[in-house]
Amino acid sequence: MSKKDYYDLLEVGRNASIDEIKKAYKKLALRYHPDRNPGNQEAEEKFKEVTAAYEVLSDSEKRAGYDRYGHEGASGGFQGFSSAGDFSDIFNDFFGGGFGGGASRSRAKRSTTGVSGADLRYDLEITLEDAFKGIQAPIHYVTNVKCDTCQGTGGEGAIKPVQCHTCQGSGRIRTQQGFFTIERTCTTCYGEGEIIQNKCKKCGGSGRRRDEVNISVSIPKGIEEGAKVRISGKGEAGTKGGKSGDLYVYVKIIFHKIFARNKADLHCKVPIRMTLAVLGGEIDIQSIDGAKIKVKVPEGTQTGTKLRCREKGMPYMNSHARGDLYVQVIVETLNPKNLTKKQIELLKALEEEENASVQQQSEGFFSKVKKK
């Protein structure tokens, strides 16, 4: 290591207080720490230098010797770390062991808490009639399920994993390079802290396997487009004893040829005869549940008029109430090619009557104008 000035390395003056030295070291240590600069040899060397400077300048006796005699006065420079623990004690004063993956000096056993499986999505198409009455929908999908041979342990004969002998269960390996301690992922257990001695032949040691799942999903009546139904525990299987994820079934309602839906209300269009529109009467239509209902058509109904049928729409979710059905009337015009002789005669008579009525109205209008 080059003999650089310790004060310059920490970017402080020679009269700096111990608090200023600590603050400067913390800033530089964070900047150059190997965990923040993986593979950067220059940063690693810089980290070693600022740590060596701090070890001397934070000790009043070593600092006094350094100020008077230079590096020789500080007992040969950076000699203070006789074990891997010495470096950790200094660095943990600042960061609480926040770097290096968290394995403690006592090599505490790595937590083997299970990992939950992923949630899954399934898109289900149903008819409007299905949404009206509610159904039990059979679905099937392929996902990772718990291996039934090893019961999810990954070991042959359902034998559970054992603690890794290389890292003693921590999942991390610490090596001492002079005064500097480097911590890396254990290459034996790949950071798991445990190993499977004899892997299950069916799942290859993963504890899971790909398989088809067949279940029945309850779709409640009144469900709307885009709504989702959650089935707990039917997602991807977890690992290391972790719980399975959930399955979310998203509902898509197929386009209906007759009814359009707006929440719990239904809308439809019904053609009626011109005479019915003029004289009024009743029409029979079929509702979404297949029942026939009578709809009253008032006299003088115009095209586009909406007739409301109360509580003949879709059911509300988790309720016995229903929305309304709106029937939009389309008044049909007469097709001259399909008229009978009698119908033509009646229309001519109607035309003569209308002309006479118009003539009387015109004469009355002009007589009023003349009087003025």
Curated annotation (Swiss-Prot):
Main location per the UniProt record: cytoplasm
PROSITE patterns: DNAJ_1, DNAJ_2, ZF_CR
Binding site for Zn(2+) 1: C147, C150, C200, C203
Cofactor binding, per record: Binds 2 Zn(2+) ions per monomer.
SUPFAM superfamilies: Chaperone J-domain, DnaJ/Hsp40 cysteine-rich domain, HSP40/DnaJ peptide-binding domain
UniProt GO molecular function: ATP binding; heat shock protein binding; unfolded protein binding; zinc ion binding
Xref: InterPro entries: DnaJ, DnaJ_C, DnaJ_domain, DnaJ_domain_CS, HSP40/DnaJ_pept-bd, HSP_DnaJ_Cys-rich_dom, HSP_DnaJ_Cys-rich_dom_sf, J_dom_sf
Gene Ontology cellular component terms for the protein in this record: cytoplasm
The keyword Repeat appears for this protein: yes
ZnF (CR-type) residues: 134-212
Ranges for domain J: 5-70
UniProt keyword annotation of Electron transport present: no
UniProt record, GO biological process: chaperone cofactor-dependent protein refolding; DNA replication; protein refolding; response to heat
Keywords assigned: Chaperone, Cytoplasm, DNA replication, Metal-binding, Repeat, Stress response, Zinc, Zinc-finger
Binding-site positions, Zn(2+) 2: C164, C167, C186, C189
CXXCXGXG motif repeats: 147-154, 164-171, 186-193, 200-207
Top-level taxon in the UniProt lineage: Bacteria
Compartments (UniProt record): Cytoplasm
Entry cofactors: Zn(2+)
Similarity remark: Belongs to the DnaJ family.
Role of this protein: Participates actively in the response to hyperosmotic and heat shock by preventing the aggregation of stress-denatured proteins and by disaggregating proteins, also in an autonomous, DnaK-independent fashion. Unfolded proteins bind initially to DnaJ; upon interaction with the DnaJ-bound protein, DnaK hydrolyzes its bound ATP, resulting in the formation of a stable complex. GrpE releases ADP from DnaK; ATP binding to DnaK triggers the release of the substrate protein, thus completing the reaction cycle.
Comment field on protein domains: The J domain is necessary and sufficient to stimulate DnaK ATPase activity. Zinc center 1 plays an important role in the autonomous, DnaK-independent chaperone activity of DnaJ. Zinc center 2 is essential for interaction with DnaK and for DnaJ activity.
PANTHER family found in the cross-reference section: CHAPERONE PROTEIN DNAJ, DNAJ HOMOLOG 1, MITOCHONDRIAL-RELATED
Subunit structure: Homodimer.
Protein name as it appears in the record: Chaperone protein DnaJ
Organism: Wolbachia pipientis wMel
